[in-house]
Amino acid sequence: MPITKTIQPKYPIRYKSFSGLIFVIIILLVSPLDACRLWATISLPGYTLFDSDNNLDSTIREELTEFQLQGGCRENSWPYNNHNGWAMVYYSDTAIYESNQLIRSPLPAETDSLSFYQFVSQMLSEDSQSTIGLGHVRKASSGATDIPNPHPFLMTFQGRTYSLAHNGNVDKTVLLNLITDDGSDYEWIDSHPPQTFGHGFWQDDEGWNYVVDSELIFLWIMKNIRDENDDIFRGLLAALSVLEKEHQYGKKNIIFSDGSDIYAYRSTLSTTIDLFYSDGSFVNPELNPPDYHYSVMSTPPQDGLAGQLNWYPIDHRMLAVLSKDGIQEYENFPDHVINSDDGDRKSVV
């Protein structure tokens, strides 16, 4: 019997109709919360994640307290089942130079408190000068399981470190065929072989079993960014438009960053809304001015100061771009047509 949790969504959510609101509440009442959970945040210009003024440090810590609880698995009424490790990374620049900016653990975040909060304290310290953070708590559905959480996947390319965390599942054979152009071009994947975590060559049967589908999604996106002359927006558009045509039923909730911006994409036929962003504003106007950060979470806090932030749902097939200058939504992103407003920018304001 799956564990379920009754949720009374205290964070304000924009709905297009009252019937849509009722439908989503009903789904939330009966849906088990047993998928991977994602978190990311970006500070606004002139601020780092350290800044405690205007409630910034407080709300981020509350987001991460909730996020840690989502990385656990207990008996009885515990609503989460993300016990296959946790990981976080933070940026102080567009490239990640120090190994201490990344942590990966094979343990459930909910029970790995010492390591979790040591890293959080470091990430939010003044010395770190951090401006972007990403996190993932894992319920393994593809590839190796008893390993430190491999999300977010990282690649340093052309002097910039890219990162991706994913919730969902996509057929690995479909992804391999996309990356290799149906087996005719192995140049990209040979240059960036997927990990097998100690189980041999990725093309061998054993090695392939341990490859994680999310890393192949990352490689496919990065190949398209390269092919689009390092234009992230166009690369994401090219990669996701093809992927949605080839594998429209796979769950593809993605957080992607280049160290300058955060790109959050939601794609799932599940009726549960499971990716939200906050623009830093509060429900209660007396708490404004707003926090000087934007965040993305699969399941935002419902209590405390972070629970009083405005949290907006990212709809099916929507891309939300969180930059230091604002947030831009792209509805039905895979069908987006590039226009003059998009230009050749690597990030979208």
Model-derived segments and their meaning:
Residues P106-Q122, V137-G159:
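Short acidic (Asp/Glu) patches
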Residues E66-N76, G183-E206, E286-N288, N339-D344:
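Surface-exposed intrinsically disordered loops and tails
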Residues M1-L33:
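Secretory targeting signatures
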Residues D171-D258:
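Short histidine
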Residues S31-L114, L269-T272, Y312-P313, R317-R345:
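Extreme N-terminus nucleophile/cap motif
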Residues M88, P150-V170, L240-P301, G307-L319:
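Conserved catalytic micro-motifs used in adenylation/nucleotidyl-transfer and phosphoryl/amide-
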Residues S121, I132-G135, I225:
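A basic- and aromatic-enriched beta-loop-alpha substructure that forms the phosphate/nucleotide-
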